[in-house]
Amino acid sequence: MTIAEIRKHAATRMDQSIAAFRNNLQKIRTGRANPALLDAVQVDYYGALVPLSQVANVALIDARTISVQPWEKGMGAKIEKAIRDSDLGLNPAAMGDLIRVPMPPMSQERRKEMTKLARNEGESAKIAVRNLRRDANESIKKLVKDKLASEDEQKRAETEVQKFTDKHIAEIDALVAAKEQEIMAL
């Protein structure tokens, strides 16, 4: 592996870490309804647990209500039970074939818990980015040790990897701040 390949690999992996972090942030509940909130709900489908999105259509009705439309008529009760049993604190209501999931207003205490969760996710993402930096720097040092690169190239490459790291950590901080603001907004 050359230094250029190591840098490219590190940048790609850091981008993937940011994408995974964004995905995790979407699952954190805010005051508004978000269909991604129900992604983690598992439904019993003929003896197997499957994600809700594989047995129903999940959409927004308005800013505070999610609709769940089962693809099979008999699945309504199971979907309703799965949503109620999830640790999201939601209370679905069946209206014929359609299940409405109103988002209850969050208490101040719950909002603080959610911001803490967002910060913890941010810290985990930063740790992942820093670990990728460490791995890249170790690979670069190995090239120098094996005499496949000079020490000047090592310094340049490490500086570039550090710039990638700083950029990605700043992006994580910005995403966490935006999520905190979204959670605390009434």
Curated annotation (Swiss-Prot):
Q: Name one GO cellular component term.
A: cytosol
Family matches, as HAMAP family? RRF (MF_00040)
**Keyword terms, alphabetized:** Cytoplasm, Protein biosynthesis
Q: Where in the cell is it found?
A: Cytoplasm
What superkingdom heads the lineage? Bacteria
Q: Name one GO molecular function term.
A: ribosomal large subunit binding
Q: What is this protein called?
A: Ribosome-recycling factor
Cite the InterPro entries for this sequence: Ribosome_recyc_fac, Ribosome_recyc_fac_dom, RRF_sf
Q: What does this protein do?
A: Responsible for the release of ribosomes from messenger RNA at the termination of protein biosynthesis. May increase the efficiency of translation by recycling ribosomes from one round of translation to another.
Give the UniProt family note.
Belongs to the RRF family.
Record GO biological process:
cytoplasmic translational termination
